[in-house]
């Protein structure tokens, strides 16, 4: 098992850039449609819940509900963009298009490919999260400088969720299995992590579950930054996101090597 992990590591510190660039060049042809697609869902939540439910809710934690919600949607947009890129587009490149098979005939290793795919998913997550943030800043729900401070956390959020989704990609026999991850993990996480309402409104048992969810850690950093509130336990939240980004990377890489190169 140890040899499997070692063999799955990236060959060096730069091969992954070629994988990232390949994905970027392919994406550039459909960039506008891709960006609009990633923004549509969070914007519907933002204006649908924010404008409609916000009239009944009023203020939450001292700010308007739509301002509270906008910060949650920034993190959620990063989560969904990186997750869908990894479980669908990455799986297509690995299985249907057989792009990985062609790449593996070069000096690039499985680890290089996975690292490049994760970096690309984090890039798309950054674009999606920043897009929602730009809308929020334009409408006055956050300051522009606050959005700039939030960008590294948005990117880290994308990297963490891409890394987690890569495990699903490594194990899934076909596209149909991804619906289980979407409905049983991603969707519940949206409502349990404080994206649409405060976590302290949840029952006690659910609040304990929330503490281990990566989206909750992301929101607990992004929301205070965007709303100008004090940051609490920021080191813990960033450390948790780093763990979610790093540990699944090694696990998924080993699983993919065993799957593709038995």
Swiss-Prot record:
UniProt entry keywords in alphabetical sequence: Cell inner membrane, Cell membrane, Membrane, Nodulation, Plasmid, Transmembrane, Transmembrane helix, Transport
Chain's role: Part of the ABC transporter complex NodIJ involved in the export of the nodulation factors (Nod factors), the bacterial signal molecules that induce symbiosis and subsequent nodulation induction. Nod factors are LCO (lipo-chitin oligosaccharide), a modified beta-1,4-linked N-acetylglucosamine oligosaccharide. This subunit encodes the transporter.
Family according to the record: Belongs to the ABC-2 integral membrane protein family. Lipooligosaccharide exporter (TC 3.A.1.102) subfamily.
Topological relation to the membrane, as annotated: Multi-pass membrane protein
Main location: membrane
Gene Ontology CC: one annotated term: ATP-binding cassette (ABC) transporter complex
One example GO MF annotation: ABC-type transporter activity
Protein name in the entry: Nodulation protein J
Disulfide cysteine pairs (residue numbers): none
Quaternary organization: The complex is composed of two ATP-binding proteins (NodI) and two transmembrane proteins (NodJ).
Pfam family, one: ABC2_membrane
Domain spans labelled ABC transmembrane type-2: 33-259
GO biological process: oligosaccharide transport
Gene: nodJ
Membrane-traversing stretches: 35-55, 62-82, 102-122, 127-147, 148-168, 177-197, 231-251
Source organism (scientific name): Rhizobium meliloti (strain 1021) (Ensifer meliloti)
Cell compartments where the protein resides: Cell inner membrane
């Amino acid at each position: 098992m140890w040899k499997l992990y070692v063999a799955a590591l990236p060959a060096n510190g730069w091969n992954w850039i070629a994988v990232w660039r390949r994905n970027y060049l392919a994406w550039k042809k459909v960039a506008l449609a891709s960006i609009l697609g990633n923004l549509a869902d969070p914007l519907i939540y933002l204006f649908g819940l924010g404008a409609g439910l916000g009239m009944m809710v009023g203020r939450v934690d001292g700010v308007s509900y739509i301002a509270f919600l906008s910060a949650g949607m920034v993190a959620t947009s990063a989560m969904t963009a990186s997750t869908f890129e990894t479980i669908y587009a990455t799986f297509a490149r690995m299985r249907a298009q057989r792009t990985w098979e062609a790449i593996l005939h070069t000096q690039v290793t499985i680890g290089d490919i996975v690292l490049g795919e994760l970096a690309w998913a984090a890039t798309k997550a950054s674009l999606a999260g920043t897009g929602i943030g730009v809308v929020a800043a334009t409408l006055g729900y956050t300051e522009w400088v606050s959005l700039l401070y939030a960008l590294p956390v948005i990117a880290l959020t994308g990297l963490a969720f891409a890394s987690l989704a890569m495990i699903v990609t490594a194990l899934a026999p076909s596209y149909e299995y991804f619906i289980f991850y979407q409905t049983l993990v991603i969707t519940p996480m949206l409502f349990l992590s404080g994206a649409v309402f405060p976590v302290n409104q949840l029952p006690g048992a659910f609040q304990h579950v929330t503490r281990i969810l990566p989206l909750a850690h992301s929101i607990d950093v992004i929301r205070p930054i965007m709303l100008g509130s004090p940051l609490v336990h920021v080191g813990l939240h960033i450390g948790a996101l780093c763990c979610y980004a790093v540990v699944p990377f090694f696990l998924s890489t080993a699983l993919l090597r065993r799957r593709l190169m038995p």
